[in-house]
């Protein structure tokens, strides 16, 4: 339900699980012990930054599915994006999965915009697992 000019209250939405995969700098920071998976090398054992980003996303998808006890077929929508305005990383990785993909680009706001889109789909009952 919309309240005011730019806010909404959602009543039937919750965050079931998360997965966080990082490189060495995050691993060595104050939150390092809380991440699901970390890499010791900056390129995550890949040959380029882009391939490293792809591996981080693959790992996060697999971990999140596992933590939720879900198969790909259980997911109604996968919503996400990256800092590249062509959504290259997400597009390349999601080709490997049978997940309906909705790419979002908002630069630094991509994560929050993705959550808002997913929550709205759930609230409207367009899906159960987003």
Question: Which sequence ranges carry the predicted segments?
Answer:
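Conserved "HGTGT" condensation-loop signature of ketosynthase/thiolase-family condensing enzymes
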Residues: 1-102
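Active-site-proximal alpha-helical scaffold in enzymes
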Residues: 105-130
